């Protein structure tokens, strides 16, 4: 037995609902990921920008030490294990061996259990451990994380389907009346004062199948109805003359898949060519449609592609484990050339992660910032509790809580498509109906970043301490006003902050195209000199609603961050010098957004 010392931060929470699934085959060969220390800390000035480094510079200055890699390799070999791959820049080493040998090398005991799937139905069968790990004494301080021994699911997809009950609450006798629904505004054969009554507008008659482009039109009075991503981008005044040309959007998926037929059906319906979409397998995972997570995958690709149709997409598929998650992100960030932006719509309550997993993943996000790659992450769909089974307690979602990513919260967006104006935008909150709310709050583990120091981040609800505030930005997320997408050959409305991460990724691709810039960590540029209670340039300030423990108000808040985007104004703010076609940057209030009336296509008759 090797001389072992504890690995700090490797403790895993005990699963109270795990059930034994029989005997684990300890002779089975598996692969784990070791994360090594940096040769030097990435300077804050490099993370904050605007300067960036190349992959070669990052590897040489902030990657793993060559001597450390050699020592880990020799130590693993002495223990009967095999180093199968090494990535100096991302500081990862892949080590294979039998379960018995790996358990002995890292001081743990593994069992086989079943536990409930995260964000889905059914049970997952996986290896399981509780307590902490150890490492050979010679590697103390060199190996900072050992991932993959316990392969429990770690994240849930942050998307929500429109329910019949939710649809029936928005299209009611109070919102659709003889005064708003007339022969002049809607075809009398489809919707009339005689057909819209308390008896006809019910959860049984108003469903995702009945709320379609043929039944909901812009001529009707503005109401809470599903939209296309193109319409959302238009209401948010995404910069004219941009489409993502020359940019790459990387998308991280931990399950599910997409079909080309779904993409072709969706984009042809919008009058767009299907963008370049390439599936990239990580550690043996692959594009696997026919699973519950298909809705997540299709939503991400379709929203990003609709708002940035000329951007190339690389969709990374990995197993839903901490090992799979970090390997996918590292592969996306450290590819050559690096992507413009990485979109992540998966996460889990911050307290459910091991410290070593959070720290290792946050390190990759710091790499992204140094390389000029922006990372957009969904802030969660369960309000301030970040727990789908409870509204008590407060937690933020990780990886959205990392200070090196752009955390994306949720709103309910109602717009007048005739005038291309936002008529109402409030915090998304349907918690009382068990239908989700935008995540937000204050981190328990990440300190307050410098760029949030003056915006009024509160103390954690029920506490006297503060930390990194979540989210940074927001966008349309309520399934009632969500996004019409195609999944398994059927058009359906889907929402959740899962939609906001790719929406912002598409916007950033367009901003990068317009400015020729790599934005990296966007927050220093968008927070700038914003102070508590003040609106930020380039944003629609959301001031109504709450997500449970936190309420919206003027300026940054823990429900919608700085607000939803006012794209053209944001471009002006981020441009140096500003484009000739833009005006003085302003913070656009939600009641008076600007923008041209869009060209009308069939999909704008929603």
Language model regions located:
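Long, low-complexity, intrinsically disordered segments
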Residues: 232-235, 239, 588-606
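An often Trp-containing, charged/polar helix-loop segment at the C-terminal end
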Residues: 412, 456-462, 512-558, 562, ...
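Substrate-binding/charge-relay-adjacent region of secreted/lumenal peptidase catalytic domains
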Residues: 2-85, 94, 99-184, 189, ...
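Walker A/P-loop NTP-binding active-site region of P-loop NTPases
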Residues: 507
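Ser/Thr/Pro-rich low-complexity tandem-repeat tracts
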Residues: 172, 177, 215-217, 581-587, ...
């Amino acid at each position: 037995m090797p001389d072992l010392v504890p690995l700090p931060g490797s403790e895993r929470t005990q699963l109270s609902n795990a059930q034994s699934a029989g005997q684990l085959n300890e002779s089975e060969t598996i692969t784990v990921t070791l994360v090594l220390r940096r040769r030097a800390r990435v300077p804050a000035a490099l993370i904050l920008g605007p300067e960036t480094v190349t992959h070669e510079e990052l590897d040489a200055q902030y990657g793993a030490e060559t001597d450390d890699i050699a020592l880990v390799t020799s130590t693993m070999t002495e223990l009967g294990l095999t180093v199968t791959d090494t990535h100096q820049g991302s500081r990862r080493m892949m080590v294979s061996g039998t379960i018995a040998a790996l358990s002995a090398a890292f001081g743990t005991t593994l069992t086989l259990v079943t536990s409930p799937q995260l964000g889905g139905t059914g049970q997952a069968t996986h290896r399981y451990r509780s307590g902490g790990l150890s490492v050979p004494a010679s590697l103390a301080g060199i190996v900072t994380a050992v991932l993959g021994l316990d392969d429990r699911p770690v994240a849930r997809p942050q998307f929500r389907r429109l329910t019949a009950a939710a649809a029936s609450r928005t299209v009611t006798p109070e919102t659709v009346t003889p005064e708003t629904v007339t022969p002049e505004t809607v075809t009398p054969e489809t919707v009339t004062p005689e057909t819209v009554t308390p008896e006809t507008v019910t959860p049984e008659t108003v469903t995702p199948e009945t709320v379609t482009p043929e039944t909901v039109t812009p001529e009707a009075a503005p109401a809470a109805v599903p939209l296309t991503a193109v319409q959302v981008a238009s209401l948010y005044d995404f910069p004219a003359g941009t489409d993502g040309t020359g940019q790459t959007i990387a998308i991280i998926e931990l399950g599910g898949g997409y079909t080309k037929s779904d993409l072709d059906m969706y984009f042809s319906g919008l009058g767009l060519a299907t963008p370049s979409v390439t599936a990239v397998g990580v550690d043996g995972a692959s594009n696997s449609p026919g699973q519950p997570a298909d809705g997540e995958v299709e939503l991400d690709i379709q929203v990003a592609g609709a708002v940035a149709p000329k951007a190339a997409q690389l969709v990374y598929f990995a197993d839903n484990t901490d090992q799979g998650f970090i390997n996918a992100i590292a592969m996306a960030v450290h590819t050559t050339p690096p992507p413009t932006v990485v979109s992540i719509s998966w996460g889990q309550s911050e307290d459910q992660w091991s410290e070593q997993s959070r720290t290792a993943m946050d390190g990759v996000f710091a790499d992204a910032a140094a390389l000029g790659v922006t990372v957009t992450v969904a802030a969660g769909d369960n309000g301030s509790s970040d727990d789908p089974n409870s509204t008590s307690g407060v937690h933020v979602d990780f990886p959205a809580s990392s200070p090196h990513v752009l955390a994306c919260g949720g709103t309910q967006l109602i717009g007048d498509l005739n005038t291309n104006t936002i008529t109402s935008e409030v915090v998304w909150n349907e918690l009382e109906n068990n239908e989700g709310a935008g995540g937000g709050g204050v981190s328990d583990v990440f300190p307050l970043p410098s760029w949030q120091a003056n915006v009024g981040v509160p103390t954690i609800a029920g506490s006297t301490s503060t930390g990194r505030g979540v989210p940074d930005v927001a966008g349309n997320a309520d399934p009632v006003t969500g996004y019409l997408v195609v999944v398994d050959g059927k058009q359906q409305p889907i929402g959740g902050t899962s939609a906001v991460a790719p929406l912002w990724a598409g916007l950033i691709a367009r901003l990068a195209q317009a400015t020729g810039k790599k934005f990296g960590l966007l927050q220093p540029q968008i927070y700038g000199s914003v102070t508590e209670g003040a609106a930020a340039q380039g944003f629609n300030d959301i001031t109504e609603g709450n997500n449970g423990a936190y309420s919206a108000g003027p300026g940054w808040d823990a429900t919608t961050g700085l607000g939803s985007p006012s794209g053209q104004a944001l471009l002006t703010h981020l441009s140096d010098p500003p484009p000739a076609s833009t005006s003085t940057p302003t913070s656009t209030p939600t009641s008076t957004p600007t923008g041209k009336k869009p060209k009308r296509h069939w999909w704008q008759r929603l």
